[in-house]
């Protein structure tokens, strides 16, 4: 997603001299001081930025275009490292010789006390020391728009339409500690959150992980307006499809909008693989469909899927896809369930229930590509681009390998309370960048149906502080005191606390939806077949 670049970085300078005059002033100053160094244009621009004259990027500015004292840290990296991380699970075993971490069950979690953060940098110089961790954003929250139409106009100006020139990549930026504007909702105010993600209720002692806001370089994300989004979703269906990270994001989206509906006008129904949150007043639904590999697999049971030997049918998608047809907004993901082994087991005829199950093995990246090709063919054939919008979420990183952010003696993400914001080296948290690249290439190659690739990976790698760690469930029960005392085995560094990081992912989705032109009228949900 690109939005118009914010002019002048931290805000316009009233009566500021022209660029030529500014450059001349720098040369004049150098001559007066007797400096006989020939500056090239890049050095001059850097000097101007350091002295606050003009400038395009905001270095350390808060949201909305400025704010001295805002803590801002950057990460724009899209490097490629292929260490393997634990797959969706509870027990982490010692890595096999291939360097792949193997994992078994399906859930564990954790907590976080302090430490000095580590900054990931984005190609800019990392010599400067970030501001004190206690600095906070001093700006006041932006005023609420007086109407949905005003908010829509503002969002259109930022995200949609013709950018008229230079635009801004919203996935390149920094995390800003913004106690005034974050979080977007309170954990205690959203009754639809599951115990898996309610970290504060489950015993986490700090809440700083809720107060970081993503600030793109040189532009701003539109402020989340639940009422505006629900107007866009009136008579429509929005569905997350994939694994438990997409379920994590679905819960976030439900909490972001649910306060706009009275209690008696909203409901949540769980029916096997499909969870449906309905807002009667808007005749809209926000849904989650469990399909961890998108295609058929032996892990498709939404409740009993703690399977070590995962087997897939890479060309069989129709059974799941029958539930996606006609949905107005589709948000797909698949990643963490691929990370158990370096090879995937492919069903060789027959069915998963027939014993013994016969299968072939395929290298993981090749199998992932085969599955995404099956998925993309279904999308191209069955999705009407005039009616529906498709998103694909990039890799949600795990934080199992603390040496990757400079703490070899730490235990995974346990006791992390701050993002990796001061780390001057490349983060190495075990992300499989080959799978990332495969998903990116497949989605970009699609012709008939455009797919929005939501690039959450690099910005999420910084957030080692935001996982559920030991403050979560294990096999449907909260961790015991004894289990919490054993974070090496029980800390969940896969899933995320809510409120938290997935709210930012949904802000990207929100930006696309509210800035897109209104789709043609569709048949109200009440007249569509009920799922």
From Swiss-Prot:
> Where are its TM segments located?
23-45
Question: Ranges of Low complexity compositional bias?
Answer: 146-155
- At the top level, the lineage of the source is Eukaryota
The EC code for this enzyme is: 2.3.1.-
Q: Where is this motif: DXXH motif?
A: 492-495
Q: For the motif GDS motif, give the residue ranges.
A: 242-244
Name the enzyme group at the top EC level: transferase
Q: Does the keyword Transmembrane apply?
A: yes
Q: What is its main location?
A: Golgi
* GO MF annotations in UniProt: O-acetyltransferase activity; xylan O-acetyltransferase activity
Which segments show compositional bias classed as Gly residues?
A: 53-69
- Positions of region (Disordered): 50-164
Q: What residues bear carbohydrate chains?
A: 271, 283, 422, 455
The record's account of tissue expression is: Expressed in roots, leaves and stems.
Key words of the record: Disulfide bond, Glycoprotein, Golgi apparatus, Membrane, Signal-anchor, Transferase, Transmembrane, Transmembrane helix
One GO CC term of this entry?
Golgi membrane
Q: How does it sit in the membrane?
A: Single-pass type II membrane protein
| Lumenal-side positions | 46-531
Protein's GO biological process: xylan acetylation
The record, for InterPro entries, names: TBL, TBL_C, TBL_N
What is the purpose of this protein?
A: Xylan acetyltransferase required for 2-O- and 3-O-monoacetylation of xylosyl residues in xylan. Catalyzes the 2-O-acetylation of xylan, followed by nonenzymatic acetyl migration to the O-3 position, resulting in products that are monoacetylated at both O-2 and O-3 positions.
Family the UniProt entry places it in:
Belongs to the PC-esterase family. TBL subfamily.
Q: What is this protein called?
A: Xylan O-acetyltransferase 5
Source organism per entry reads Oryza sativa subsp. japonica (Rice)
């Amino acid at each position: 997603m690109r939005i118009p670049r914010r002019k002048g970085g931290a805000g316009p300078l009233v009566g500021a001299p022209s660029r030529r005059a500014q450059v001349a002033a720098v040369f004049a100053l150098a001559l007066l001081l007797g400096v006989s160094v020939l500056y090239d244009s890049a050095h001059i621009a850097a000097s101007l930025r350091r002295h606050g004259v003009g400038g395009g990027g905001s270095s350390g500015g808060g949201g909305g275009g400025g704010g001295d004292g805002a803590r801002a840290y950057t990460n724009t990296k899209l490097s490629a490292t292929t260490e393997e991380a634990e797959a969706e699970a509870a027990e982490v075993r010692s890595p096999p010789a291939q360097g792949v971490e193997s994992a078994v069950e399906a859930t564990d979690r954790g907590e976080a006390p302090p430490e000095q953060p580590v900054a990931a940098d984005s190609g800019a110089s990392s010599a400067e020391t970030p501001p004190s961790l206690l600095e906070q954003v001093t700006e006041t929250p932006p005023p609420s728009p007086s109407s949905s139409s005003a908010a829509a106009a503002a969002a259109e100006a930022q995200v949609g339409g013709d950018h008229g020139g230079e635009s801004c990549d919203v996935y390149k930026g920094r995390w800003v500690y913004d106690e005034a504007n974050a979080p977007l909702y309170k954990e205690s105010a959203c009754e639809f959150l599951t115990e898996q993600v309610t970290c504060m209720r489950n015993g986490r002692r700090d809440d700083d992980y809720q107060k970081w806001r993503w600030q793109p370089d040189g532009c701003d994300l539109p402020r989340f307006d639940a009422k505006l989004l629900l107007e866009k979703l009136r008579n429509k269906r929005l569905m997350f499809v994939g694994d438990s990270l997409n379920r994590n994001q679905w819960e976030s989206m439900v909490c972001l909008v649910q306060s706009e509906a009275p209690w008696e006008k909203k409901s949540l129904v769980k029916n096997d693989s499909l969870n449906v949150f309905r807002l009667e007043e808007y005749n809209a639904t926000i849904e989650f469909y469990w399909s961890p590999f998108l295609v058929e697999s032996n892990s498709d049971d939404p409740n009993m899927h703690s399977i070590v030997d995962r087997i897939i049918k890479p060309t069989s998608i129709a059974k799941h896809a029958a539930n996606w047809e006609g949905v107005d907004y589709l948000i797909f993901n698949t990643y963490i369930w691929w990370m158990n082994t370096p090879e995937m087991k492919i069903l060789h005829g027959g069915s998963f229930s027939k014993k013994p199950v016969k299968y072939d093995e395929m290298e993981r990246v090749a199998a992932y590509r085969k599955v995404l090709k099956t998925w993309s063919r279904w999308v191209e054939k069955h999705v009407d681009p005039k009616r529906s919008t498709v998103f694909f979420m990039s890799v949600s990183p795990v934080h199992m390998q603390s040496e990757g952010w400079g703490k070899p003696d730490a235990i995974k993400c346990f006791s992390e309370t701050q993002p990796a914001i001061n780390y001057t080296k490349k983060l190495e948290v075990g992300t499989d960048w080959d799978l990332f690249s495969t998903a990116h290439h497949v989605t970009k190659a699609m012709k008939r149906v455009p797919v929005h690739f939501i690039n959450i990976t690099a910005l999420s790698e910084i957030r080692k502080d935001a996982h559920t760690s030991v403050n979560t469930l294990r096999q449907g029960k909260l961790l015991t005191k004894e289990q919490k005392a054993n974070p090496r085995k029980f800390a969940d560094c896969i899933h995320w606390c809510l409120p938290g990081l997935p709210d930012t992912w949904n802000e990207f989705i929100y930006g696309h939806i509210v800035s897109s032109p209104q789709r043609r009228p569709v048949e109200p949900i009440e007249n569509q077949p009920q799922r």
